[in-house]
């Protein structure tokens, strides 16, 4: 496709839809600067193992729903700086990409998105997912957004604002390995939103103050930062907010350093929660690694200086 001129194309909907035997695809020469629609573009490209769309522009993009649906063999997806900042519908964008082990969304803007239904549904090999670039202020539906992400262990939703959401049904359903969901202390689901089975099957989930998964509480009732027995929840305070007071500052960095180098805090009843919030880095590709070191303290200090606090 190296000679294909797409400079005036406005729609690429269904372009490779149902190319079920396609094993390789080079779209590096595509000019997508005028393209408004990419819905179902690579849908059911079941044998593709890698795809590079890092050259794609999302400047004009309005719809990207089911763009990579059921690319079942896809192990590597390079999005580069591709960002659907103007797109409103991201429904099922990566649904069924069950072989993806990682996905770099660090430059992925969602400022206009209103629908994230099933966005990562069935991405059963994803172990980590960095969504810190996401803006969800306008999102009304996250139904089954992470459903079946059974390898996912930690999820940082610190940037998520679901105050406009009307449907969060099955949002984390069957995320059986999910241990920790980080969120801003202000995180809340609007009263009246549909939330049936929001946490159903999240059998490994533990809130920041130790509240363990209970099959009797799987709706939005526990979709809040865990405050223990008085206000149980399945979420943990924002990563780096070590003392859990809703602010990220130099005090948190100092506590993290003390945890790393002394035994000063180990007798406190909230030590486990503090340890979890201090463990912000160290794993391959970023994220918590089960240890607190001086590097965690330095990372928290840097975040505080940059004003990234809750």
Go through each PLM region and give its residues:
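Negatively charged
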Residues: 1-238
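Cellulosome-associated attachment modules in secreted, modular CAZymes
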Residues: 235-310
């Amino acid at each position: 496709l190296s000679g294909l001129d797409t400079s005036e194309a406005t729609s690429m909907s269904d372009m490779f839809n149902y190319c079920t035997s396609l094993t390789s695809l080079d779209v590096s020469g595509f000019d997508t600067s005028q393209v408004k629609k990419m819905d179902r573009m690579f849908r059911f490209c079941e044998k593709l193992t890698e795809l590079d769309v890092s050259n794609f522009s999302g400047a004009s993009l309005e719809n990207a729903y089911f763009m990579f649906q059921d690319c079942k063999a896809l192990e590597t997806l390079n999005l580069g700086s591709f960002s659907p900042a103007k797109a409103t519908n991201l429904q099922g964008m990566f649904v069924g990409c069950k072989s993806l082990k990682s996905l770099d969304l660090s430059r992925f803007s969602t400022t206009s998105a209103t629908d994230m239904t099933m966005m990562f549904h069935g991405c059963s090999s994803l172990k980590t997912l960095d969504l810190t670039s996401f803006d969800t202020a306008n999102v009304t539906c996250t139904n089954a957004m992470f459903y079946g992400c059974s390898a996912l262990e930690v999820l940082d939703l610190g940037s998520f604002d679901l105050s406009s959401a009307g449907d969060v049904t099955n949002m984390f359903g069957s995320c059986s390995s999910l241990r920790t969901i980080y969120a801003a202390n202000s995180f809340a689901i609007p009263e009246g939103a549909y939330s049936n089975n929001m946490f159903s099957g999240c059998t490994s989930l533990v809130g920041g103050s130790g509240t363990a998964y209970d099959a009797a509480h799987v709706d939005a009732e526990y979709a809040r930062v865990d405050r223990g027995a008085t206000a149980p929840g399945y979420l943990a305070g924002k990563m780096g907010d070590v003392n859990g007071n809703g602010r990220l500052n130099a005090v948190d960095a100092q506590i993290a350093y003390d945890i790393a180098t002394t035994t000063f805090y180990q007798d406190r009843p909230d030590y486990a929660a503090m340890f979890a919030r201090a463990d912000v880095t160290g794993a391959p590709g970023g994220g918590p690694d089960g240890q607190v070191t001086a590097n965690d303290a330095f990372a928290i200090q840097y975040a505080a200086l940059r004003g990234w606090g809750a």
